[in-house]
Regions:
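Short, flexible helix/strand-to-coil boundary loops that buttress conserved ligand/catalytic motifs
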Residues: 17, 61, 118
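Charged phosphate-binding loop/patch that engages nucleotide di/tri-phosphates or the phosphate backbone
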Residues: 95-121
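Mid-chain, well-packed structural core segment of small domains
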Residues: 58-92
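Glycine-rich nucleotide phosphate-binding loop and flanking beta-alpha elements
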Residues: 11, 57-59, 113
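Short secondary-structure boundary segments
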Residues: 7, 53-55, 76
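N-terminal first-folded block
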Residues: 2-49
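Acidic, metal-binding active-site segment of PIN/NYN-like and related structure-specific nucleases
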Residues: 44-61
Length: 121
């Protein structure tokens, strides 16, 4: 499973993921000036899951009824891997099949909520 870490999360997230067995890169390594639609297209073409704290990606998936890329939204006041990283990793591992097929996961400190793509109104 390949994870692309959005600019609104620290590059430490990519390192944190790699330490736990995920192929992971930070957006700064592939070009940070991309618009959201271009970023989603880039991730989908390369089979990356997008890890972000930006809720706009979920809204874009809903508006376009898109199936790819899968998006994992981190919803927490504390965005450091040390604060919520293990919860995010657990959600990724638990939902691996769904993420391959297309899913939106919202993760907070207490739970992860999974929605299968495309999102229904």
């Amino acid at each position: 499973m390949k994870v692309l870490v959005d600019m609104n999360l620290s590059p430490a997230w990519a390192h944190f993921r790699r330490e736990r067995g995920f192929e992971s890169i930070h957006l700064s390594a592939v070009g940070s000036g991309r618009a959201d639609a271009e970023l989603m297209h880039w991730a989908a073409e390369r089979d990356y899951i997008l890890l972000t704290a930006d809720l706009d990606f979920g809204a874009t998936l809903a508006a376009t009824r898109g199936r790819r890329p899968s998006v994992v939204q981190v919803r927490s006041d504390l965005l450091a891997p040390a604060a919520i990283g293990d919860v995010v990793v657990a959600a990724l591992r638990q939902s691996q099949e769904e993420l391959v097929d297309g899913a939106l996961i919202s993760v907070d400190a207490n739970r992860a909520r999974l929605r299968i793509l495309p999102l229904k109104s």
